[in-house]
Amino acid sequence: MANLNKRPDWIKVKAPNSTEYYNTKDLIKNLRLNTVCEEAACPNIGECWSKKHTTVMILGSVCTRACRFCNVKTGRPDLLDPHEPQRLAEAVQKLNLKHVVITSVDRDDLEDGGASHFAECISEIRKSSPNTTIEILTPDFLRKEGAAEIIANAKPDVFNHNVETVPSLYKTIRPGARYYNSLSLLHNIKKLSPDIFTKSGMMVGLGEEINEVVQVMDDLREAKVDFLTIGQYLQPTKNHAEVAKYVTPEEFKYLERVAKTKGFLMVSASPLTRSSYHADEDFQKLKENYQQKLVS
């Protein structure tokens, strides 16, 4: 049996050590912004921050959910910061970002789940950086009537909401969420605003079966999702769900091939793939693939 306490060589990454990495870190700190890169202990932080790519986490640093895979703090959430959208827009401008990814903690305590705050962030970025494309990675807005409409009207270039895992694992891995609610949210955004690219991602290595992963692909295509990401689950701490399997690079290539046969415009599948990993480059490929589909 494989030693799951030791990560395989294909998972290992270099420790961050570049000047640009520290410059990005200082800017984020000085503007009092949170990033999912830090809070979720992302393995790609060194590479991304060295390129001045960062995923800002809005709506505070404390989540109202306690998913078994996630390293973000859970508990009583922070007060909403009305100046956060302006500081975020300033960071985008100072980093000279061509493409920005914005995510958030879950805010079940807010009437709209934080949807209007996302909309304000998009609006502020559009004012100061009109040529920057905007990708948002949102919570599921469970039982938040009108949230999808607020998001669709804000017109992000990409709407991302992750299903995270297969439905059979939701009770243990994502107990506060509902699989079919996530599918419904993705479908509703596309229905409300067909010109917004939709995206979703999932982790593997949590104990799912291959046929379950393929079924999720089919469900996402039924919801008109354009872009699928698949990455290896990594246990943040001993208090989180254990890794059931380290999926090999060859198995990821197989999943990518299968996903492409389903009709996704874009598929990214590898051990280190995360929702916002190479998001700027992937967005360009996504647009190119869409244009090719139009003329084919």
Curated annotation (Swiss-Prot):
Catalytic reactions on record: [[Fe-S] cluster scaffold protein carrying a second [4Fe-4S](2+) cluster] + N(6)-octanoyl-L-lysyl-[protein] + 2 oxidized [2Fe-2S]-[ferredoxin] + 2 S-adenosyl-L-methionine + 4 H(+) = [[Fe-S] cluster scaffold protein] + N(6)-[(R)-dihydrolipoyl]-L-lysyl-[protein] + 4 Fe(3+) + 2 hydrogen sulfide + 2 5'-deoxyadenosine + 2 L-methionine + 2 reduced [2Fe-2S]-[ferredoxin]
Location of this chain's protein in the cell: Cytoplasm
InterPro entries linked: Aldolase_TIM (IPR013785), Elp3/MiaA/NifB-like_rSAM (IPR006638), LIAS_N (IPR031691), Lipoyl_synth (IPR003698), rSAM (IPR007197)
Keywords: 4Fe-4S, Cytoplasm, Iron, Iron-sulfur, Metal-binding, S-adenosyl-L-methionine, Transferase
Keyword Magnesium carried by entry: no
Primary location recorded for the protein, binned into one broad class: cytoplasm
Pfam families the record matches: LIAS_N, Radical_SAM
Name by which UniProt lists this protein: Lipoyl synthase
NCBIfam families given in the database record: lipA (TIGR00510), PRK05481.1 (NF004019), PRK12928.1 (NF009544)
Listed PROSITE patterns: RADICAL_SAM (PS51918)
EC annotation from Swiss-Prot or TrEMBL: 2.8.1.8
Cofactor: [4Fe-4S] cluster
Stated family: Belongs to the radical SAM superfamily. Lipoyl synthase family.
Pathway connected to this protein: Protein modification; protein lipoylation via endogenous pathway; protein N(6)-(lipoyl)lysine from octanoyl-[acyl-carrier-protein]: step 2/2
Cofactor note: Binds 2 [4Fe-4S] clusters per subunit. One cluster is coordinated with 3 cysteines and an exchangeable S-adenosyl-L-methionine.
Record-linked CDD domains: Radical_SAM
Residues of the Radical SAM core domain: 49-265
GO cellular component: cytoplasm
Annotated [4Fe-4S] cluster 2 binding sites: C63, C67, C70
Example of a GO MF term: 4 iron, 4 sulfur cluster binding
Binding site for [4Fe-4S] cluster 1: C37, C42, C48, S276
Class in the EC hierarchy, top level: transferase
